[in-house]
Amino acid sequence: MPKADIHPEWYPDAKVICNGEVVMTIGSTQPEINVEIWSGNHPFYTGTQKIIDTEGRVDRFLRKYGMLSNNSDDQK
């Protein structure tokens, strides 16, 4: 048996709140959880993600250490 009076209170219907709106309910030790970003408004999950870095990391590494010429079309 678990020891009495050492465990935090459990809230099986804790509300997750984003921008003043309840977005889901979960089990937690807090009655309300305020978040700024959740899967419903995160760019990765909504499909509005923007690609900022158009240069590949490998190409940048190879060029930085002189293993790739400036014209990478010859090697592709």
Curated annotation (Swiss-Prot):
Keywords: Ribonucleoprotein, Ribosomal protein, RNA-binding, rRNA-binding. Pfam families: Ribosomal_L31 (PF01197). It comes from the Bacteria. InterPro entries: Ribosomal_bL28/bL31-like_sf, Ribosomal_bL31, Ribosomal_bL31_A, Ribosomal_bL31_sf. GO terms for cellular component: ribonucleoprotein complex; ribosome. One of its GO terms (biological process) is translation. GO terms for molecular function: rRNA binding; structural constituent of ribosome. Belongs to the bacterial ribosomal protein bL31 family. Type A subfamily. NCBIfam families: L31, PRK00019.1, PRK00528.1. Binds the 23S rRNA. Part of the 50S ribosomal subunit. This is Large ribosomal subunit protein bL31.
